[in-house]
Amino acid sequence: RRPVASINFVTAHDGFTMRDLVSYNEKHNEANGEGNNDGESHNRSWNCGVEGDTDDEKVLVLRARQQRNFLATLLLSQGVPMVLHGDELGRTQQGNNNTYCQDSELSWIHWEAMDQPLIEFTAFVSKLRHDHPTFRRSRFFDGRPVRRGQGEKLPDIVWLKTDGTEMLPEDWGSGFGRTIGVFYNGDGIQEQD
């Protein structure tokens, strides 16, 4: 199978929106009238230190960065990215991860509350994906060295440590690493779309 067979997503219609994914540790489905028993309780979310809405600037900055991290990872991964409508706008459902029964303010798009910096970031990363074929290859990376012209042979993909050196097999098992870099070699593309 090829990369186009992979549908990649962070959030979907069943579950938290991306903003809620970084704003709530727990679901808040009380408005659904089922005693908060409906919807998945295992959300793999992190509220960045405060449950729900906050005015804490440090928390808001971290949440914005986490949303950008998710969008960049999604849009620059191989395969087909699926963005939940409204995630690029910063849409919230106030922690409700199961709005199937909500035809109300809770599930509607609030156009006046759009997160303009997030929209601009999403547009920038989308254009980057569009303009650079290495982010949407027709075949997976295989690590083979490639060379075009007289230049040095470089693998089609290289995983990097924080100091810029190539990761070794033992680095993958390190429990303390929090950062990873990747180099995509555009010369490694064999077939153009």
Q: What is each stretch, according to the model?
A:
Residues 1-85, 98-102, 133-136, 140, ...:
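Conserved alpha/beta catalytic core and glycan-binding cleft of carbohydrate-active enzymes
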Residues 1-3, 90-128, 132-135:
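Active-site-proximal helices and loops of the catalytic beta/alpha 8
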Residues 18-21, 93, 191-192:
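Short helix/loop capping segments that flank catalytic or ligand/cofactor-binding pockets
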Residues 47, 109-112, 160, 173:
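Short linear interaction motif-like sites in intrinsically disordered regions of transcription factors
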Residues 57-62, 112-116, 169-171:
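Short, contiguous acidic/charged loop-to-helix segments that flank catalytic cores in large enzymes
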Residues 73, 108, 179-183:
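Conserved hydrophobic/aromatic beta-strand scaffold that supports enzyme active sites
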Residues 154-193:
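Carbohydrate-binding surface patches
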